[in-house]
């Protein structure tokens, strides 16, 4: 009786910073072609080459149905962005568009719950969802069509691979560093893992992000300045952005590059920004459109 089976040798391969991760490094064919008690012939089928850095594909198989398809963002950011984009396209005579609208979601967190971009996808948008916490990857791959990047973001391309501590605490997790929401004082009893920073420009190059982006959602628990510190503003622009509690240095960079804060959408500091050269809508119209979806907490910004 002939018997064929595949076994995998479990090895390790180095990631950024020398971190070791489990991987299938060697596949072996065990082929018994004579009697049951004959010797096994071991043949190497494939040896996975060790890679020290860079992006790797992860293929997640899923056959599940979303539990709640009617999820919306926390303060109707998704509805506001859809309405503002439609109005701006009409004003610029860009309707209908030949290409889908595009978003960048950082950090994406859950695929559906409180997502700022799930509804955009339901309306035909394409985009990139960036999320460092593997807790969210399965649902993102199962329920979303966006390109998923599993990485902690920050720094400039030449510093890609810098090792940092990352707090795994759901939607409030993130890079652990002084001055950020996750710092050594409040992360002592939180699970922390080592992660490697990669610049947002490296991600954009990897995923062929268009140079004019319709919307960016930026909420990384106080690390927004770290993400955007070396951003190439001359090469990329965002028509609309929502940013949670941007620090003064990021606000200044935005203003210097043609952006204007027009609304504070929440009591916890979610702000709406426009790229003035790209958005043709007057402030009164922006406020009016936003007020149709969120008129409880938002504050108009006039200066």
Positions of PLM-derived features:
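Phosphate/nucleotide-binding beta-alpha loop and adjacent structural elements of enzyme active sites
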Residues: 1-303
């Amino acid at each position: 009786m002939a018997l064929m089976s595949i076994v995998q040798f479990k090895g390790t391969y180095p990631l950024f910073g020398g971190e070791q991760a489990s991987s299938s490094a060697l596949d072996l064919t065990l082929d018994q072609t004579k009697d049951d008690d004959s010797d096994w012939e071991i043949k190497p089928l494939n040896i996975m080459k060790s890679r020290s850095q860079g992006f790797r594909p992860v293929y997640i198989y899923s056959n599940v149905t979303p539990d709640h398809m009617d999820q919306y963002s926390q303060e109707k950011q998704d509805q506001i962005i859809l309405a503002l984009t439609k109005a701006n396209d009409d004003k610029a005579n860009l309707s209908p568009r030949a290409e889908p609208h595009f978003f960048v979601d950082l950090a994406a967190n859950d695929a559906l719950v409180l997502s700022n971009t799930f509804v955009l996808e339901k309306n035909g948008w394409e985009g990139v969802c960036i999320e460092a916490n593997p807790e969210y990857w399965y649902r993102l791959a199962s329920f979303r069509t966006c390109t998923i990047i599993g990485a902690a973001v920050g720094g400039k391309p030449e510093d890609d691979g810098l090792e940092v501590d990352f707090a795994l605490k759901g939607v409030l997790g993130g890079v652990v560093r002084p001055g950020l929401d996750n710092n050594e004082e409040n992360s002592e009893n939180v699970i922390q893992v080592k992660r490697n920073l990669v610049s947002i420009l490296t991600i954009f190059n990897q995923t062929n992000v268009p140079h004019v982006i319709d919307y960016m959602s930026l909420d990384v628990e106080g690390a927004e300045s770290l993400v955007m510190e070396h951003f190439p503003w001359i090469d990329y622009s965002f028509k609309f952005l929502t940013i949670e509690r941007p620090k003064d240095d990021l606000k200044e960079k935005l203003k210097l590059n043609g952006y204007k804060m027009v609304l504070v959408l929440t009591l916890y500091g979610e702000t709406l920004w426009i790229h003035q050269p790209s958005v043709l809508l007057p402030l009164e119209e922006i406020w009016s459109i936003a007020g149709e979806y969120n008129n409880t907490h938002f504050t108009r910004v006039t200066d």
